[in-house]
Amino acid sequence: MNVHVSLSVDARHEKVLVTFLIENRGERRVGLSREIATDASLSRRLFDLRQHPGDVEVPYTGRMVKRESSSLNDYVELAPHSAHMHTIDITRAYDFWPGTHTYLICYEDAVLTDVRQLDSAAKISTEKVMFSYTQR
């Protein structure tokens, strides 16, 4: 599997917008979780968000949806030699501290290396991205 994932953050204009980019550089289709690929809002603590310095976890305060076991319908296929980008507004989903602070964010999950097999999951993770945000 030759998959590359990354995050970027735009914390201007009183919002924290996280853009997830996945590139399938391989020869086979991979399955990407719908919640990171297409969902408009979070339904669980999808990102690891921490204050910097100090490594204090920022509490997730967004909605929590109890889900059934995963099925193949929970994944979006990503063709070989293609990329997918999706942006999610996390401003109201995490309890950002008042004032201006610096944070580190990353994403860790799995992709399906065979889009027909749920048990073909392989771990993916992004590098930590540092950003500053002012909570008013």
For every predicted segment, state its role.
Residues 14-18:
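Structural beta-strand segments of beta-rich domains
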Residues 32-77:
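The feature marks short-to-medium sequence segments in extracytoplasmic or secretory-pathway proteins
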Residues 76-89:
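Short Pro-Gly-centered flexible turn/kink motifs
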Residues 5-11:
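Short beta-strand segments of immunoglobulin-like
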Residues 92-136:
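Terminal connector regions
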Residues 11-13, 40:
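Short coil/turn motifs at beta-sheet boundaries
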Residues 20-29:
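Asparagine-centered strand-capping/turn motif at beta-strand->loop junctions
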